């Protein structure tokens, strides 16, 4: 089984991991739809797209309907859209918590539910979430983000068993820090707050990775593509870490 001719939806597809994942699926012959919140960023990728805020369930359903009408039933969903904020737990507000849960957890649920009927009808499907090492361990000052990402792994493990006889597999990819524009902004934030050099700030973030490097977007994308291959047909309910041995 290959992804050639299969309809793949990648959320958060305008940049970083999502954009790289979409490109690698296109190169593998898939019919890809990317989704994101702003049209201009999506247009730049030169891949068919739908504007969609994954936290808005009605918008998700409409976007999937439009994508389905254009490119056929959905076979693969890479739920990649996400966000993180840093705040001490004592200052975590209910709204900040809700925001983290909405994009990082509810967004995954909304997208997977939108594609589930197609996958069940086909007797084959791949539900993939871009999670994080924060799905499996704690980090300071990102308690809401860690809680949401831990929940994604719980969702993944539950659905894997629920859907095990349908031909659908459900997995989460859990990378450490990935070298993206978002990471660059995080490094700049450390520099501005501490006066560190860019190199020193980068080393702080690399410290948990025994390989002392950042994960690259093609590693995450390649893992998603592998999960759609015959070689991974028994891989179900897993949280696959890409962290150089951190976890």
Predicted stretch roles:
Residues 14-15:
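Conserved glycine-rich cofactor-binding loop
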Residues 88-89, 96-101, 205:
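Substrate-binding pocket helix/loop in short-chain dehydrogenase/reductase
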Residues 112, 148, 156:
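Active-site helix of classical SDR
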Residues 117, 161-162, 233:
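Alpha-helical segment proximal to the catalytic Tyr-Lys
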Residues 132:
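Residue(s) in the substrate-gating loop at a strand-loop-helix junction
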Residues 164, 169, 235-237:
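Short, small/polar-rich loop/turn modules that mediate ligand/substrate recognition or access, typified
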Residues 211-242:
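C-terminal substrate-recognition "lid" of short-chain dehydrogenase/reductases
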């Amino acid at each position: 089984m290959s992804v050639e001719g299969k309809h793949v939806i990648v959320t958060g597809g305008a940049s970083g991991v999502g954009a790289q994942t979409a490109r690698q699926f296109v190169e593998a012959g898939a019919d890809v739809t990317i989704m994101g919140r702003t049209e201009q960023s999506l247009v730049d990728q030169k891949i068919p797209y739908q504007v969609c805020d994954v936290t808005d369930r009605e918008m998700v359903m409409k976007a999937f309907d439009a994508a389905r009408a254009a490119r056929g039933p959905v076979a693969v969903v890479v739920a990649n859209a996400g966000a993180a904020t840093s705040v001490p737990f004592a200052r975590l507000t209910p709204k900040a918590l809700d925001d983290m849960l909405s994009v990082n957890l509810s967004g995954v649920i909304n997208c997977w539910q939108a594609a589930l009927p197609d996958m069940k009808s086909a007797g084959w499907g791949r539900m993939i979430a871009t999670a994080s090492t924060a799905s499996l361990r704690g980090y300071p000052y990102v308690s809401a983000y860690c809680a949401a990402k831990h929940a994604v792994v719980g969702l993944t493990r539950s659905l894997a068993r629920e859907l095990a006889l349908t031909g659908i597999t459900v997995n989460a990819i859990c990378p450490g820090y990935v070298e993206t524009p978002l990471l660059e902004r995080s490094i700049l934030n450390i520099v501005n707050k501490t006066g560190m050099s860019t190199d020193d700030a980068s080393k702080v973030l690399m410290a948990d990775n025994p390989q002392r490097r950042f994960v690259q977007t093609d590693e995450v994308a390649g893992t998603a593509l592998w999960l759609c291959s015959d070689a991974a047909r028994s891989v179900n309910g897993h949280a696959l870490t890409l962290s150089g041995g951190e976890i």
